[in-house]
Regions:
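Outer-membrane beta-barrel pore domains
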Residues: 3-5, 29, 37, 41-44, ...
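Outer membrane beta-barrel
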Residues: 63-96, 100-238, 242-251, 326, ...
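Enrichment for repetitive, rod-forming helical segments
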Residues: 11, 125-126, 136, 203, ...
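N-terminal periplasmic/intermembrane-space "pro-region" immediately following the signal or transit peptide
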Residues: 1-95, 417
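Small-residue packing motifs within transmembrane alpha-helices
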Residues: 6-14, 214, 243, 323
Length: 417
């Protein structure tokens, strides 16, 4: 761990600890009982968390968030964050090319030490996310710890953008943007499960560029021009349309495609993903205590003679479900999310690119993540299982990449504020 990272991590963690303590104190401090009023006042509206980063249903950000008057930077700037630790054990660890050894069977790490700064009022708004993180996901790639993940992925300022909101219909964003594509977010705390799934592995996570948004009644539309898979080549268009059918049902469609071929290779991605076209169809419904979210995915990678590979297609389907126990029950704060996925690739071993466990491979996954949150504090356990067929060595699991399955057990615990 180099000095710059150590300094940043120490300062970020210190700031997070101080803010978390402030939030916890504010949450736990009681005041003397007031003199009863002649008549009860109407109940105030429930406080809302900051708009960014986005969160799934199993964890909730602190509400209301800590708000500060920062003068020229805004009089209602909210500052929040997450500090969390992560422990993992796995079967069939894969070969780690950076160390020349097999990936560790067990790992203890810092999964998040991040601060979030939001200004979400007025015409000029902004969001800044800063800190350290790791990005565990279901794949045949070795785990990259939080001391190295920012340098290998999106830096210590992974997301940050300026947002112009001229009216209630239109808005515009520029900067490092969360992707419009897919049904899972980038960071562990944002999702139902700690690890992102198989389908997430072929989706962009953060893209740099510009984005326009419009809302027309129940229909919300966003279109972006970006560098796609963080390639630093601005040749990719993406879009998202979301139809809010009613209070409990939404239907969404997204896509991303490059406008021309590219041969960019970075630590984050490759020409395979940089030249990928992807579509997702997603439906979300709430039934009682259940949130049910199925989605379908299709990807296509066109041949690239410069890099030397042919065409590859993939089809995927996933079902994400969360059951949250009633807030009035003895198990208030407990939820049980799970995810089931299937992904199939169409390609030949000769020259097709690899987007799974070798050209022509397919895989199933099952992940369950019992979760408990009390105020800002949370803990969740996770068990995941992946089994693949038509695995091409060395793209599978194990030291030689010839194994077709992996089991993982994970604990993540921390504080959101």
């Amino acid at each position: 761990m180099n000095y710059r990272f150590t300094t940043l991590l120490a300062s970020t963690a210190g700031a997070i600890a101080a803010l978390a303590a402030t939030a916890a104190f504010a949450d736990d401090t009681t005041t003397p009982a007031a003199t009863p009023a002649a008549a009860p006042a109407a109940a105030p509206a429930a406080p809302s968390p900051a708009p960014y980063p986005a969160m799934s249903a199993s964890l909730a950000a602190n509400a209301p968030p800590l708000t500060f008057d920062l003068g020229i930077l805004g009089s209602k700037v909210t500052i929040g964050g997450v500090l969390s630790g992560y422990g993992q054990a796995q079967s069939n660890p894969v070969f780690n090319g950076s160390t020349g050894k097999t990936d560790q069977k067990s790992t203890i790490d810092l999964s998040n030490a991040q601060l979030f700064i939001n200004k979400s009022d007025g015409v000029i708004q902004y969001f800044v996310q800063v800190g350290a993180y790791s990005l565990p996901n279901l794949s045949d790639l070795p785990y990259t710890g939080s001391s190295k993940a920012p340098a290998a992925d999106f830096g210590n300022l992974p997301q940050g953008f300026l947002k112009i909101v001229p009216n209630s219909v239109f808005s515009f964003e520029i900067g490092a943007l969360p992707t419009l594509v897919g049904d899972e977010y980038t960071f562990t705390f944002e999702n139902l499960n700690v690890e992102r799934g198989l389908l997430w592995g072929v989706e962009p996570a953060v893209s740099r560029g510009v984005q326009g948004n419009a809302t027309f009644g129940p229909l919300a539309i966003s279109v972006a021009w970006t560098d796609g898979f963080y390639s630093n080549k601005y040749n990719t268009i993406s879009g998202l349309a979301t139809w809010t059918i009613n209070a409990t049902n939404t239907l969404a469609f997204d896509f991303q495609t490059p406008t021309d071929k590219q041969n960019v290779i970075t630590s984050i991605t490759s020409p395979v993903l940089n030249n990928e076209t992807i579509y997702n169809l997603m439906y979300t419904t709430t039934v009682g205590q259940f949130l049910i979210n199925p989605y379908l995915q299709y990807t296509s990678v066109s041949g690239n003679t410069v890099v030397g590979y042919g065409k590859e297609e993939s089809w995927g389907a996933a079902l994400l479900v969360n059951y949250a126990f009633d807030a009035k029950s003895a198990l208030a704060g407990v939820s049980i999310p799970f995810r089931v996925e299937y992904m199939s690739t169409q390609g030949t071993e000769v020259n097709a690119p690899n987007v799974l466990y070798g050209p022509g491979s397919n895989a199933w996954s099952f992940t369950v993540t019992p979760t408990y949150q009390f105020k800002q504090y949370f803990i969740r356990a996770e068990a995941s299982y992946v089994t693949a067929s038509k695995v091409i060595t060395p793209d599978g699991y194990g030291f030689s990449g010839d194994k077709n399955s992996q089991v993982r057990g994970i604990i993540e615990t921390g504080v959101l504020f």
